Amino acid sequence: MTNLSKSKYTTYWQCPKMLWLDVYKRGEKAEPDMSTKMRLEAGTKVGKLAHQLFPNVVDATVTDANGNPDTSAMIARTQQMMANSSNSPKINPRSNSFNSPNSPLVIAEAAFSYNGCYCAVDLLVQTPDGWDIHEVKSSSFPEQDGSPSELKKYAPDIAFQKWVLTQCGVNVTGTHLVCLSAEYVRHGDLDIQQLFVIIDMQNVGVKKPMDLIADEYLKVPINVAKAQKMLTDSQTEPTEDLDRHCEKPYPCLFWDYCSRHLPSPSVFDVYGGSFTSKGDDRFYLDKKLEHYRAGRVSYDDLVDQPLGIIQRMQVERQTHIDAGAIRSFLNTLRYPLYFLDFETMQFAVPEYDDSKPYQQIAFQYSLHVVEAPNTICDKKGHGYLAPSDGSDPRRKLAEDLCAYIPMGACTVVYNDTFEKSRLKEMAEIYPDLHDHLLSIRDGICDLLVPFREGHYYLPAMGGSFSIKSVLPALFPSDPDLDYHNLPGTVHNGGEAMTIFPLIQSMPPAEADAARQSLLEYCNLDTWAMVKVWDKLMHV
């Protein structure tokens, strides 16, 4: 019989083939991206912090000689803790009495096994009649419990735990999701009670409460039996085809393997396709799947199908340059032009005052200034990189920014939503810089516009209008504009976000090299915008 952990169960729930591949063809699995790795690291930190929600926490974790969880020992330890709890006071954990001498027992990593199914409950909280499951996630939700649609993806995980515990004879009296409060703003020391939101998964929603666990709980034994039977056969690969489960609730790392039969490019490379995208010119994922199921998978298969303007250019491999529209865009610019780009980092648990979970914290910016039309600036612009001392970088960055960009300036960015948001956030916490920062924000012009609107399109862009796609399409033979050629360790925003917080713990020589790498990367971001602007000027 194949053992099923809660992670394996939820993988099966999303896609049986994904679980089978994870067990028998793990070498086909893509490496998780930087954001996924950071989310996993954040989950560990958030999980430990959640222990502080309760004063009477005992940890059932036991590790072997290699530092790995000793599941058998953890199960035995959990049983002993629960047996000893029979003498503990029976206080309702939802009565806000945690600081009293009668606080309920809380077992962290409480481990259980039944018929080949294993789970370790993040926090198992004693109640007057049994035990409540508390599953800790590093996601953030509003104080009002979020919405059922946002929370449903956590239900299979919790339902599996409830089923295993119930089969082990535990009376599960409640199931809860413990997550970060999206509304929490740090002021001084962390307020653990305000940092977290505890959501009753059997009573979700304000206007029309829903039990998100009941239906999933009934499916658990059926799914367990099917998953265990499937995993007994290492030779027969499941036949699940491409569908929504390839991206929801989590992107599948076996996509390249499962889509290897598709031509390149394929229908799934056509511009658009987010589950939540809206707009007449978006090529919805549902539409892509409809074409795929009908056998229309290559660009040639799509030529005679109804398409939006951008999709049509992409599928027909058109080069489209609308000189008039580009000129109209350029005429909106006011000189001198200040080309600006921020680098940011984010923390699941706010590190600084006046910040929220996962808020983007600007620690660096780059600036190139073009004084007049038909002129060009030096390749090396002005760069600001905050001190690597662990302090909040935003104040000094905002001061430096205001010193270099005057009020009323025309500031050019690429995808203005990001820079506008950072400027607004800093303006809100620094009253003396408020007007200046908002003036910079109000003067922003978005260089993305002529590409996003389809005024300038080349087949090499592949339907993507990010600067990382536009730049090599416009300058295919310029090694100085190739991010891969940057020296050092920083070649993209994810690496910048990861490396900066680590610099303070690096040896001096390594720290200096990392800072130089950050400066060169960010400088290329704004120099790239200057080159793109110059290309548009010569249309």
What residues fall within each predicted segment?
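Metal-dependent nuclease catalytic cores that hydrolyze phosphodiester bonds in DNA/RNA
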Residues: M1-D129, G272-L307, M313-T319
